A protein has these predicted regions:
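Short, conserved beta-strand edge motifs with alternating hydrophobic and charged residues
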Residues: 19-21, 47-51, 73-76, 103-105
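Short, small-residue-biased leader/transition segments that mark boundaries at the very start
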Residues: 1-3
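Active-site pocket-lining/capping segments in soluble small-molecule metabolic enzymes
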Residues: 53, 103, 122-159, 163
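Alpha-helix-loop-beta-strand connector modules within alpha/beta enzyme cores
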Residues: 29-50, 86-109, 151-174
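Catalytic alpha/beta core domains of metabolic enzymes, predominantly
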Residues: 58, 62-64, 68-128, 155-160
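Residues within the DNA-recognition helix of helix-turn-helix
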Residues: 6
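Glycine-rich phosphate-binding active-site loops on the catalytic face of alpha/beta enzymes
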Residues: 9-27, 70-83, 120-141
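Active-site-adjacent beta->alpha loops and helix N-cap segments on the catalytic face
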Residues: 22-42, 55-61, 79-93, 110-115, ...
Length: 175
């Protein structure tokens, strides 16, 4: 199994944590598979990833993931972005009552992290802090595309230290 092999490889490489999740075709937490993957994870902390946002019953799903022994759930509160899902994130945190960490993520940035913290009650956040960085290439042959016409081939999204700093500062209420 590919996922299990990746778990073993990550553990062997000294990973501090693992991130994965699995649902059944009907939108339930795939308990048999997750039990197998949790066993393969050993004592390495596991974050159940945003598959959680696609599960059909987040209340039951939360309890199942807690019972599996995961350390965290990464979620946008079953909405396109975590700020939009702040209400469910708050409900999950209250229901979890310290048994698992709810990690708010998706669309989190320096402009919304403080309000998200206040509205959701979350204490941990996942964010990419990406900015568009232009290529040093000055010449472009408009007749030849290397990919989709919808993508700017001379722009890369890169996590920048400055944006990470700004986002953390905003969360802490600093300038």
């Amino acid at each position: 199994m590919c996922i299990r092999d990746s778990i073993y490889a990550a553990r062997e490489a000294g990973a501090d944590g693992l991130v994965f999740g699995a649902l059944t075709p009907d939108g339930d937490i795939d308990l048999p598979l997750m039990k197998e993957l949790m066993k393969a994870s050993g004592d390495c902390p596991v974050t159940f990833h945003r598959a959680f946002d696609r599960c059909k019953d987040p209340i039951r799903g939360l309890e199942e993931i807690i019972d599996l022994g995961a350390a965290r759930i990464l979620t946008s509160g079953q909405q396109p972005t975590a700020p939009q899902g702040a209400g469910l994130i708050r409900s999950l945190i209250e229901q979890a009552n310290g048994r698992i960490i709810i990690l708010a993520g998706c669309g989190v940035n320096e402009n919304n992290i403080r309000q998200l913290a206040e509205e959701s009650g979350a204490h941990e956040f996942h964010f990419s802090a990406r900015e568009g960085i232009r290529s040093a290439m000055r010449y472009s042959n408009p007749e030849v595309l290397m990919g989709s016409a919808d993508v700017d081939e001379y722009l890369r999204n890169v996590t920048t230290a400055e944006r990470v700093r700004r986002t953390i500062a905003a969360c802490l209420g600093e300038k």
